[in-house]
Amino acid sequence: MQKTVWITGASSGIGREFARRYAKMGCCLILTARRADRLEALAEELKQAHGTVCRILTADLACEEECTRLCNELAVETLDIFINNAGF
């Protein structure tokens, strides 16, 4: 069964590397960060390299309203793994 992984801070650094590793393992990814352009580039890279299905959710996790929005949006998702990597 394919796992779903949500990674915050996915646009660079450790978060990006987590995304690459889980994509290589065949997981579906939910990528969250502030920069949509970086997330879109990463999603395309992972799709080309591994056929990975990525969902992009842009948000500034330092903002309480955006955290609430994400939680509400993902409340119906089945998450197997959560990587809380967003930095401030």
Report residues per predicted region.
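A glycine-rich helix->loop->beta "capping" turn
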Residues: 50-53, 72-84
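Conserved hydrophobic beta-strands of the Rossmann-like cofactor-binding core
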Residues: 4-7, 82-83
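The beta1-alpha1 cofactor-binding region of Rossmann-like NAD(H)/NADP(H)-dependent oxidoreductases
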Residues: 58-69
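N-terminal Rossmann-fold NAD(P) dinucleotide-binding loop
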Residues: 15-16
